[in-house]
Curated annotation (Swiss-Prot):
Descriptive protein name: Thymidylate kinase
PANTHER family reported for this sequence: THYMIDYLATE KINASE, UMP-CMP KINASE 2, MITOCHONDRIAL
Cellular component per GO, a single term: cytosol
Biological source species: Deinococcus radiodurans (strain ATCC 13939 / DSM 20539 / JCM 16871 / CCUG 27074 / LMG 4051 / NBRC 15346 / NCIMB 9279 / VKM B-1422 / R1)
Pfam families: Thymidylate_kin
Keywords linked to the UniProt accession: ATP-binding, Kinase, Nucleotide biosynthesis, Nucleotide-binding, Transferase
PROSITE patterns associated with the record: THYMIDYLATE_KINASE (PS01331)
E.C. code: 2.7.4.9
Function: Phosphorylation of dTMP to form dTDP in both de novo and salvage pathways of dTTP synthesis.
Domain of life: Bacteria
Amino acid sequence: MSQGLFITLEGPEGAGKTTQLARLEARLRAAGHAVTVTREPGGTPLGTRVREVVLDPAVEIEPLGEFLLYSASRAQLVREVLRPALERGETVLCDRYADSSLAYQGAGRGLSLPLLRQITAEVTGGLTPGLTVLLDLDPALGLQRAARRGQPDRLEQADLTFHRRVRQGFLDLAHAEPQRFLVLDATRPEDELEAEIWAAVSERGH
């Protein structure tokens, strides 16, 4: 059985990742593909607990500790969900993955990118997406969108300067790996974004 395709959706707060992930899942299933959908942090019992902690506005976490919590969740997700699904030949869709740590804890919090990459390589065993869709959005607009969802979480409460660094971090990652990244303007109509994402997935044999 051939290895499945690993697709991640990335972007700043309020970019519409969850919406496009659901649309892509529906298209893949309609085309007859077996699909596993998950998210970071989350996707496992440990990941769910980590998510509760890192997004809780009442919890203060220093930057390296924050990264290590995400890494613990990621290690569990790779072992329990991602690798088994890919080995079954399934298409895996993940709402955020390692690039989010490089953007948020690296560019955003100022941690050493070489250190983060080294730890991430160990945590993931080198598991890299075949396609990463980056929904790019001005942070001010993204935070406005996110605020409409309700009480902001710990990351959404960070200042605009932090979120601008995160956005630039994502764009720098995409510039460094243009073969893996598809960068889309998240202010475009949802139907247009869905069509471009589907075209990129189809180019990769799906």
